[in-house]
């Protein structure tokens, strides 16, 4: 990461896409997409997804590392070209506890990530815990971030410190996405970004972490990009120019969250304006969902009723029976809920792919289609971009490859923006 940031600060138009997903097909796609390039791939886990207690993926940081490395080995992607990151590392998962208890767990969380070899660490202590004022004072946020940084430094080896980098600040919704419709978004003021940096510098130095400050590579700010279930707020470069100009006087770049669904031109403009780390998650699993839905429609027409997977019906049944991952995010009416379950841009389906019933139904669908010759006309109907690539000889009409290429479409836009 440090080399990439140095190149950007030297005037090169270069950025990196941060893949925030634990889905094996998304990770496979991210690695396979850059297998034949010289680029490194940044894959990040969030604190609620992966933590010392397992998170909702039932993986510790060490488990997640091995999970990613196993996929890399299978794909033929060199492990040393993978950068592992930890996102929103702090009290996010334990906000219902008092600050002392939550921070104690947060310290162990950060240590677990660093011990597992994660080298990009987002120190995010911005969330209020039980008994805390809402919002927290910037000084309190910075002091808690310094505690987390001290924890990281205490377990990092000398070799790890050479690679270790920190991201500070937050200007994003709670990890997982917006819970309500958005109409506009507040762009971070330069004064607030400067205050984030100033308070963190003061807190780090007070804890004897002056050297660790040199490892802070980025600040999270809100450049004016966001999405909810059916709306996308697109990047307006002119609105972010004060931020773009301010960061030029520092050693750092910005990290932009929720950049999903922006245009490829917007990604290029974001990187130009020093938002050099672009995080993406739901857009990748949304593309995966689109591909699986398309293949399910194809299966319905090609496979006898008694042998079909019933994939779409299974997904719907499971999500309606177990609504805990979408209920507070989606509209309450039954028909509206169904539409959101299937097509929401926030893609809450991503939490359900590991469910045994859904996983089994998708596997059945894939087995059903693997041995079939899918008519080109059907691919044109349901996966038109992939049809074009089949026609030009770039792609084969194999279900797994069709899914990969659908996810590549998202990665292609980021590659354009992060041009190396």
Swiss-Prot record:
<dbReference type="GO" id="GO:0009401">
    <property type="term" value="P:phosphoenolpyruvate-dependent sugar phosphotransferase system"/>
</dbReference>
<keyword id="KW-0298">Galactitol metabolism</keyword>
<dbReference type="InterPro" id="IPR012062">
    <property type="entry name" value="GatZ/KbaZ-like"/>
</dbReference>
<comment type="pathway">
    <text>Carbohydrate metabolism; D-tagatose 6-phosphate degradation; D-glyceraldehyde 3-phosphate and glycerone phosphate from D-tagatose 6-phosphate: step 2/2.</text>
</comment>
<dbReference type="GO" id="GO:2001059">
    <property type="term" value="P:D-tagatose 6-phosphate catabolic process"/>
</dbReference>
<dbReference type="GO" id="GO:0019402">
    <property type="term" value="P:galactitol metabolic process"/>
</dbReference>
<comment type="similarity">
    <text>Belongs to the GatZ/KbaZ family. GatZ subfamily.</text>
</comment>
<dbReference type="Pfam" id="PF08013">
    <property type="entry name" value="GatZ_KbaZ-like"/>
</dbReference>
<comment type="function">
    <text>Component of the tagatose-1,6-bisphosphate aldolase GatYZ that is required for full activity and stability of the Y subunit. Could have a chaperone-like function for the proper and stable folding of GatY. When expressed alone, GatZ does not show any aldolase activity. Is involved in the catabolism of galactitol.</text>
</comment>
<comment type="subunit">
    <text>Forms a complex with GatY.</text>
</comment>
<dbReference type="InterPro" id="IPR050303">
    <property type="entry name" value="GatZ_KbaZ_carbometab"/>
</dbReference>
<dbReference type="InterPro" id="IPR023436">
    <property type="entry name" value="TagBP_ald_GatZ"/>
</dbReference>
<dbReference type="InterPro" id="IPR013785">
    <property type="entry name" value="Aldolase_TIM"/>
</dbReference>
<dbReference type="GO" id="GO:0005886">
    <property type="term" value="C:plasma membrane"/>
</dbReference>
<protein>
    <recommendedName>
        <fullName>D-tagatose-1,6-bisphosphate aldolase subunit GatZ</fullName>
    </recommendedName>
</protein>
